[in-house]
Swiss-Prot record:
Disulfide bonds: none annotated. The keyword Transmembrane does not apply. One of its GO terms (molecular function) is GTP binding. The keyword Cell division applies. This is Probable GTP-binding protein EngB. Mg(2+) binds at residues 46, 68. NCBIfam families: GTPase_YsxC. GTP binds at residues 39-46, 66-70, 84-87, 151-154, 184-186. The gene is engB. Keywords: Cell cycle, Cell division, GTP-binding, Magnesium, Metal-binding, Nucleotide-binding, Septation. Necessary for normal cell division and for the maintenance of normal septation.
Length: 224
């Protein structure tokens, strides 16, 4: 664990990409660090992002799940970004469009070199649906750490919450330490310190220091 803390409250909107199938055209260069947030359309992803950054409207919430399919990128500092991926699995979205999103999401996970971690958000009352498992498996196969984040934890009693957490951890045991399971209540803030600690560690991968050293060396060698 690193002692260098990232202030997630400093997150600010950077750019939106209208089509996930052409994500590379809109995202910044494949350098630095990105942490992706993915989840079903009713998983409370926007509320979680707002709670973690202590900003009420950083990520726009919608009363109609699946309505907004923009990819929103938020900048933490010059080297680090949060990527809010479109919600998946909403019933009213045409099947062909669902398939396109899933294909593009899989490609993003497999090819984005600066991706340091993926947060897969799930309503704690309905965890580990098929698409959730697919996202987790894609990330693990791409050697990307995963945080399986059970949202809306205030909806359950403490005993039921802990049983659900234990059940989910048991179901994901095959992935070993590549997948962590935690809970979050965006409403009450419970679970937030642990989640931020994990995200902070992801913001400091070993390859970031190597990348910055290479950039500095190239800059020194460049003709004036």
């Amino acid at each position: 664990m690193t002692d260098s803390r990232i202030d997630f409250r400093r997150a600010k909107f950077l750019i939106s990409a209208p089509d996930i199938a052409h994500l590379d055209q809109y995202l910044p260069g494949d350098i630095g660090v990105e942490i992706a947030f993915a989840g079903r359309s009713n998983a409370g992803k926007s509320s979680a992002l707002n709670a973690l950054t202590e900003q009420k409207s950083l990520a726009r919430t919608s009363k109609t799940p699946g309505r907004t399919q923009l990819i929103n990128v938020f900048q933490l500092d010059d080297d680090r970004r949060l990527v809010d991926l479109p919600g998946y699995g909403f019933a009213q979205v045409p099947l062909a469009l669902k398939h396109k999103w899933q294909e593009a999401l899989g490609e993003y996970l497999q090819k984005r070199a600066c991706l340091s971690g993926v947060v897969v958000l799930m309503d704690i009352r309905h965890p580990l649906k098929d698409l959730d498992m697919q996202m987790i498996e894609w990330a693990v196969l791409s050697n990307i750490p995963v945080l399986a984040l059970l949202t809306k934890s205030d909806k359950l009693t403490q005993s039921v919450k802990m049983k659900t957490v234990n059940d989910v951890r048991a179901a994901l045991k095959e992935f070993g330490d590549k997948v962590q399971v935690e809970t979050l209540s965006s409403l009450k803030g419970t679970g937030k310190p642990k989640v931020l600690s994990i995200l902070n560690d992801w913001c400091h991968p070993e390859w970031l220091a190597e990348q910055k050293a290479e950039q500095a060396s190239a800059s020194e060698l460049a003709p004036e």
